[in-house]
C-alpha cells in the first residue's frame, strides 16, 4: 500500500473537558471506557476520505494531537508544551458545555498555539471578551467542539447552546456539540459528521493546496511549517 499523505491537527482545551474521549471516538468510532488524564501529548490517527464520493477522493492520515495540561500553567510548562505546536495544519478547540470557564479559556488556548512565540496581549477571558485583532491573521483552520451535551437538562439546553454559539463566530469556525458516550452523534450523513468532514477537507486543502481549492484569505504562515502514529504518548 502506498504511503499516505498526512496532516497534523491539535486538540486543545482544559483538562477534564473530554479531549481524550473525543479523540478516541473520532479515531476508533468507539466510546472510551476509562479515560485518564493526558500527560504531555497523546497522538492517535483517523483515516479521512478527502472529498469522499467525488473524482478527487483521496485517503489521508489525520493525526490528532491531544495536548494535556492547563492553560493557566506556569511558563515553564507552557514552554515545554510549545514543542507540540510545530507544523500544525488545523486546531480543534474543545470545551465542556457544562463548564463556562472552559469555554472562555478557548481564547487563551488558541492564542498559546497560534502565537506561541509571542506574549498574548489585550485578551480578557473573565467575561468572554477578547481582542479580535489577535485572530485577524490566523491562517489555520479551526473547529469548535462542545462536549457533555448529554449532561445538560433538556429544559436548559437551548439556553446553554445559545450562550456558547458566539465561540464559533469569534473563531470564524464551525461548531459541533456532542455526547462522547454516544457513537451515533457522528453517524454518517449527520450534520455533525458533515461539519467534521468539511473541517478536515479544509485542513488538507491548506496543507496540500490545489488550484481553485485555496481557502479564501489564507496564505503561507511561516511560523507553522508543513507517518503513521497510533496511540503514541509524549511525556
From Swiss-Prot:
<dbReference type="GO" id="GO:1903059">
    <property type="term" value="P:regulation of protein lipidation"/>
</dbReference>
<comment type="function">
    <text>Required for KRAS signaling regulation and modulation of cell proliferation. Regulator of KRAS prenylation, and probably prenylation of other small GTPases. Required for lymphocyte development and function. Not required for myeloid cell development.</text>
</comment>
<keyword id="KW-0342">GTP-binding</keyword>
<dbReference type="GO" id="GO:0001779">
    <property type="term" value="P:natural killer cell differentiation"/>
</dbReference>
<dbReference type="GO" id="GO:0005525">
    <property type="term" value="F:GTP binding"/>
</dbReference>
<comment type="similarity">
    <text>Belongs to the small GTPase superfamily. Rab family.</text>
</comment>
<dbReference type="InterPro" id="IPR027417">
    <property type="entry name" value="P-loop_NTPase"/>
</dbReference>
<dbReference type="GO" id="GO:0042803">
    <property type="term" value="F:protein homodimerization activity"/>
</dbReference>
<feature type="binding site">
    <location>
        <begin position="16"/>
        <end position="21"/>
    </location>
    <ligand>
        <name>GTP</name>
    </ligand>
</feature>
<comment type="subunit">
    <text>Homodimer.</text>
</comment>
<dbReference type="GO" id="GO:0046578">
    <property type="term" value="P:regulation of Ras protein signal transduction"/>
</dbReference>
<feature type="binding site">
    <location>
        <begin position="179"/>
        <end position="180"/>
    </location>
    <ligand>
        <name>GTP</name>
    </ligand>
</feature>
<dbReference type="Pfam" id="PF08477">
    <property type="entry name" value="Roc"/>
</dbReference>
<dbReference type="GO" id="GO:0030183">
    <property type="term" value="P:B cell differentiation"/>
</dbReference>
<protein>
    <recommendedName>
        <fullName>Rab-like protein 3</fullName>
    </recommendedName>
</protein>
<keyword id="KW-0547">Nucleotide-binding</keyword>
<feature type="binding site">
    <location>
        <begin position="148"/>
        <end position="150"/>
    </location>
    <ligand>
        <name>GTP</name>
    </ligand>
</feature>
<feature type="region of interest" description="Small GTPase-like">
    <location>
        <begin position="1"/>
        <end position="235"/>
    </location>
</feature>
<dbReference type="GO" id="GO:0033077">
    <property type="term" value="P:T cell differentiation in thymus"/>
</dbReference>
Amino acid at each position: 500500500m502506498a504511503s499516505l499523505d498526512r496532516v497534523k491537527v491539535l486538540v486543545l482545551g482544559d483538562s477534564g473537558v473530554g479531549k481524550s474521549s473525543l479523540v478516541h471516538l473520532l479515531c476508533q468510532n468507539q466510546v472510551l471506557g476509562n479515560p485518564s488524564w493526558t500527560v504531555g501529548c497523546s497522538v492517535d490517527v483517523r483515516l479521512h476520505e478527502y472529498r469522499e464520493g467525488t473524482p478527487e477522493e483521496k485517503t489521508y492520515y489525520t493525526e490528532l494531537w491531544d495536548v494535556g495540561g492547563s492553560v493557566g500553567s506556569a511558563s515553564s510548562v507552557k514552554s515545554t508544551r510549545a514543542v507540540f505546536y510545530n507544523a500544525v495544519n488545523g486546531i480543534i478547540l474543545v470545551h465542556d458545555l457544562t463548564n463556562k470557564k472552559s469555554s472562555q479559556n478557548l481564547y487563551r488556548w488558541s492564542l498559546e498555539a497560534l502565537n506561541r512565540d509571542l506574549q498574548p496581549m489585550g485578551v480578557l477571558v473573565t467575561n468572554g471578551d477578547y481582542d479580535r485583532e489577535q485572530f485577524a491573521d490566523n491562517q489555520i483552520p479551526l473547529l469548535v467542539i462542545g462536549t457533555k451535551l448529554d449532561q445538560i437538562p433538556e429544559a436548559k439546553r437551548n439556553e446553554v447552546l445559545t450562550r456558547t454559539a458566539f465561540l464559533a463566530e469569534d473563531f470564524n469556525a464551525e461548531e459541533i456539540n456532542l455526547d462522547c458516550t454516544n457513537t451515533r452523534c457522528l453517524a454518517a450523513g449527520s450534520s455533525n459528521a458533515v461539519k467534521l468532514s468539511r473541517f478536515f477537507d479544509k485542513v488538507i486543502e491548506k496543507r496540500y493546496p490545489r488550484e481553485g481549492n485555496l481557502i479564501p484569505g489564507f496564505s503561507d504562515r511561516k511560523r507553522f511549517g508543513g507517518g503513521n502514529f497510533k496511540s503514541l504518548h509524549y511525556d
